[in-house]
């Protein structure tokens, strides 16, 4: 077989690529949204997908097939007889005959179709119990093509058993994807988890529940009873539209509807359920459905042939069905059932919109499927905070976030969130990767800012590596690792301290010996350099003296400059006879020959060496060199002294390096007690405080006249709370803009079944009676007849967010002061003060980005934050404005579709409508320019009918605070505080070290007074590592203190000023293989009590506590350290034996 040419190979490759592209286009996604917690009795889950159009000739061979692992119900897979009802132009019309109502005819025939949504009785009702899934499809057809819509309904338990599978219809493949949302049991609407509870509107006031607009999918079920009119569904529609006298509509059945993505079945009609009545009324108004066409046909045209009638079934002697014949883009369902027959007669009418007007009596049909919308009350699921933790993995970190009730929002500026998620019960977990650990990892999850300290990850890796290396003694290795793996200078100080303790007796003489050798070599070089320099200076002096007395020292023959007189005399004798003055070898008596010889002669320095030897010989054994050479670095006294001094200095450095950096917000490690301020003048504080930060100020106010009189002063400012009086404007809706052309060839403009006439928001313009030949298709040659109807309407409405308008704003902080025994609290507003006889605390002003009349838009839960709109239309809204389509409790508010229609004509073509107004919804415009709007985050929101309160977690707002304490205090009365505080340590959890933190539980007893505002600290013997403000009441109080810091020997106690609990508790060691993030909002605390910083005595106390902690801890560690110390001393003794005493050396 010959080789293929390059052209053939290229064509073959192109063919394969085209085949793959075609296969990809035939794959469609059907998404099934499931809550992530599945319980019994939660009904059915439903989904649908619109497939591409297919030729009408293929419909009769269509078969819905499945490769899914769930059990499909076979009731919809069987063949069912349909009356195919079509229209066409009469064949006997002469050429150029003007179109009229008699130009068209209909035909009826019987066909068998499989897989359509003909659901028998009790199939849906028993699907959940029998674990059966229902798959079917519906058809929307014109004369040439049909567009299928596939529906899938199944028990909600399939969300557990199935993740993905394939369905097929003809040559189209349908990828069914079961996606678990972050909702526990609700449905995802507007980005929030909504549980529709229809009974809430009947039993609770309106401000206690929310109302959402949800999609409804309904399927016709035939149920025939032998007597009565209870199942004659058409009679319910006729009663609803107040139509009387219709007696021939005997079809019996009902609609079974599913609300949203999952629900219990809803029966329509049902007298005891107002949801059923709402759906029934919407069916009566929009008999073909409220979802008019697929999105890709948003701008399309149709040509209406006119009203037609036909026979169903085809064997009927007279017409039993009527409708409107059209050509162009398919709209509504083309399948239905005749209402006049007792036994169901199914009709498939491609290119005909069947009659659905319930205000007439005859020739009506009901659609097999109906899609619409309904507003329902319900409750929004409560959200919980996320827990985020990370582990080191390669150059980055692997992180995981989980929440008990689902994660509705997660993002990170430093990590890649890939949404790989899993569920365990009601928990949702998401894994992601952070590429960099050179900076702290920040994650926003469920409205909270989480920060993972990456230095603690590195510490954990250090502990793991150290323990792995010394795995033979893991207990000792881990205990040493948690001491050594400390970041910064503190860690290096710990390492040096342990090295000095264990190996100092070997390292000190070794390092001293090396340093001495280096110093001796340096001293020798310096002395040698000084000797050579002096010799060169001597030679220069000799040369200058000779030149002054005798003249030039340049040889007249070889022109060489000599340095001594003997050298010049030798040149004069030898150079003139052609001999070298240095080596005495013969040469030419010329300048060039002699100079060339001097370059290779090895004895040119002979006269300088003779002069050097005549001088005193250098003896490098005096002064510094001799002292260094005789230094006894192996002396036990020297080594022991240096060892002790180094241990003391390193302990001081270790304790001093443990202090943290001073920060504006957050805890700063201080010693016990609080600061003292002599009240010589008024005490004034003036500062700016971030909105998310609380502030604690504590001092002892001292009487300048009597230093023994001190008054405890405590000031507590809580976080800023934003109070907004709001007006609930409703729910903002998104919609698809539709532009339709409906052309009618003959007659005047009649109100045919145009799709926009049942839409909630539409405008229409009719161009009646064509006046020129240039605006008619070939088969409509008439002039002065016909109609072009242009319609613009909004379809596929979807609720996207809640909207609130700010009526008024207040910024408040709760201020509490304790001055001696006097305690006062007040919630202070902007430009307001808390005033007592001695203290004045004012909130002077607030820098804010919110203003009254601003509009707040929430596209999800309140905790997710929102957007601020300065301009929001409320009265006259145009399509495309913010707030253009609103769903309110009083109904839908439609925008003005501003613009003008234009009819585009061309000779012998159908007219097409054009619209020159805006075609993009306000929501889509907002999403395209979302970054241009101000955003805000929300923490701890509280909402009611007319008020919204929250805390700003980003510190984007700031308050100006002014505090004045008068110097005219009654020290005699206030300094004598009868309150007695006793402290006891109850429990502790967490770990010591700055990265992890601990939680200390204290029991604080207050006696002798009813209430007392103060701060309780978590301290060890030397320093304090955390504090909390507590308003103590008489009796026992349980106080939780969160702190960070300490060391392995820290016994954390509960302290008040200088008084501490009698016992302390030791926290766990920091096992930092996984580091959990902390809430940034929880750490936004500014604490200032003026306590002194840790000094020399504090350092020694801290070091001593650490040493005692090591000794009282893992005894194996102490044993290993002592053994290493003994071994180093023995090694020192062997390498540096004791020198014999002087007397023994000179003993006679």
Swiss-Prot record:
Biological process, per Gene Ontology: fusion of virus membrane with host endosome membrane; signal transduction; symbiont entry into host cell; symbiont-mediated suppression of host innate immune response; symbiont-mediated suppression of host TRAF-mediated signal transduction; virion attachment to host cell
Domain of life: Viruses
Sites carrying sugar chains: 142, 357, 409, 937
Disulfide bridge map: 34-159, 68-165, 117-136, 141-146, 183-193, 218-257, 386-445, 390-399, 415-434, 462-485, 745-780, 749-787, 761-894, 775-905, 790-913, 816-825, 833-842, 873-877, 979-1009, 1002-1054, 1019-1024, 1055-1060, 1094-1098
Keyword Repeat: yes
Keywords assigned: Disulfide bond, Fusion of virus membrane with host endosomal membrane, Fusion of virus membrane with host membrane, Glycoprotein, Host endoplasmic reticulum, Host Golgi apparatus, Host membrane, Host mitochondrion, Host-virus interaction, Inhibition of host innate immune response by virus, Inhibition of host RLR pathway by virus, Inhibition of host TRAFs by virus, Membrane, Metal-binding, Phosphoprotein, Repeat, Signal, Transmembrane, Transmembrane helix, Viral attachment to host cell, Viral immunoevasion, Viral penetration into host cytoplasm, Virion, Virus entry into host cell, Zinc, Zinc-finger
Region Binding to the ribonucleoprotein, residue ranges: 526-543, 598-615, 602-613, 621-635, 1131-1143, 1131-1148
One GO molecular-function entry: zinc ion binding
Any one of the GO CC terms: virion membrane
Positions in the Lumenal compartment: 24-495, 659-1114
Site (Cleavage): residue numbering on this chain: 658-659
Record field: transmembrane: 496-516, 638-658, 1115-1135
Membrane in keyword set: yes
Signal peptide: 1-23
Location of the motif YxxL: 625-628
Domain named ITAM: residues: 621-644
Cytoplasmic side: 517-637, 1136-1148
Alphabetical list of InterPro entries matching this protein: Envelope_glycoprot_Hantavirus (IPR016402), Gc_C_bunya (IPR048791), Gn-B_hanta (IPR048790), Hanta_Gc_N (IPR002532), Hanta_Gn-H (IPR002534), ITAM_motif_hantavir-typ (IPR012316)
Region of interest (Fusion loop), ranges: 767-787
Protein name per the record: Envelopment polyprotein
Natural source organism: Puumala virus (strain K27)
Native organism taxonomy: Viruses, Riboviria, Orthornavirae, Negarnaviricota, Polyploviricotina
